[in-house]
Amino acid sequence: MLPGTSRLPTEASMSWVLLSVLWLIIQIQVIDATLTPELKPHEIVRPKKLPISQKRGLENNQTERYGKEEKYAPEVQYQIILNGEEIVFHLKRTKHLLGPDYTETSYSPRGEESTRHSQDVKPCYYEGHIQNARGSLARISTCDGLRGYFTHRDQRYQIKPLQSTDEGEHAVLPYSWKGQDTVHDKDAEKQVVRKRSHLRTSRSLKNPNEDLLQGQKYIGLFLVLDNAYYKLYNGNVTQMRTFLFKVLNLLNMIYKTINIQVSLVGMEIWSDQDKIKVEPNLGATFTHFMRWHYSNLGKRIHNHAQLLSGASFRHGRVGMAAGNSFCTTSSVSVIEAKKKNNVALVALMSHELGHALGMKDVPYYTKCPSGSCVMNQYLSSKFPKDFSTVSRSHFQGFLSSRNARCLLLAPDPKNIIKPTCGNQVLDVGEECDCGSPEECTNLCCEPLTCRLKSQPDCSEASNHITE
């Protein structure tokens, strides 16, 4: 059951995101976007996989730790030559991309429900940076070649495989969209908030725990895909799932900046027909979804649900969320996901999630290091990977004034899908887990085996657990 109120409030604080119809123009694949004139349209590169150097005097080859059979190591390095310059990606496997109790529900043509617990999701999603390039970022999947995004020297790039192998030919494309950075119309000048009372939990935190402000926080995200979205993929659930996992990888890049780990804990696909009335009126669809969520998903462990719709809504509206609703049963949002690439979709998902976490829209001129703020009132052509000072203040206020303790609920170690030594989580069968050899600072924990060292002071496992 979701933390928070025990019944559905009759009124909810709803935050509208009013964005231009022109936004639809840029919902094409990034590779089709207008390219920066001074750069080559694309460059063909051949990534070279590099061995991970062992630090602290460790001579063991990494295959001893990861095993020869493991295709996707927890840490990898790739080298490419771009514009005559050597670039080395240093990547670490994304942790907890899926929650320990992840389920996937779909329906037969007769309406019969089928739920599976996915245990075989490829662990091929990575995050990291470019070696010796301060401020660089990389989010890349290695499932069938290298595919993803990275930033270098204030330029954004997409890399995609031309062959289904990580060391074959790849295309690297710089991208930006033609026209103004912000896309809007006259009706999208400011955020519209319904004149309804704010959702309240049973009590407020007068003296918030320091963990809420400084500690690691967790979000269990549940995705619902309507029938129109399902049809966009012609019923190919594998293709749809792979795309959404890439989006989730980008979502984590954004929320990692405020110490939040987002895990996908469930997905429901309305493959036979919609379970609510999805209509052009976004507000009405939102109300239908919120009531369906309360009646049908209350017993599934999560703390925010998003409906991704393949339909279009009136007046160019593309998203709606219940503001300040996190840790309540009304923590939901609806997003128009029709024909959006992963960058465009994650921009909307992160924005609406921000509203549920107490963040309001910020003016278009608000500055963020990446050039685009997550909570900007207008969508931008730039990947929004930063929260402004104002948004961080809003979030801190939410943590201080509301019962936001559900953000501290980490996945239960005994339910982790697949034990992985080096993920800093005490999995079943491990005596300790202090991370990779480069990360480990625990003198009693052996990072290669996740076993306690045979030293007199290292006998109590409970004293040497890193979580």
Curated annotation (Swiss-Prot):
Disintegrin domain: residues covered: 418-467
Glycosylation sites (chain numbering): N61, N236
Gene Ontology molecular function terms on file: metal ion binding; metalloendopeptidase activity
Positions of the catalytic residues: E352
Record's signal peptide: 1-33
Propeptide: 34-208
Primary role: May play an important role in the control of the immune response and during pregnancy.
PANTHER family cross-referenced by the UniProt entry: ADAM A DISINTEGRIN AND METALLOPROTEASE DOMAIN, ADAM DEC1
The protein's name in its UniProt record: ADAM DEC1
Naturally occurring in which organism (per UniProt): Mus musculus
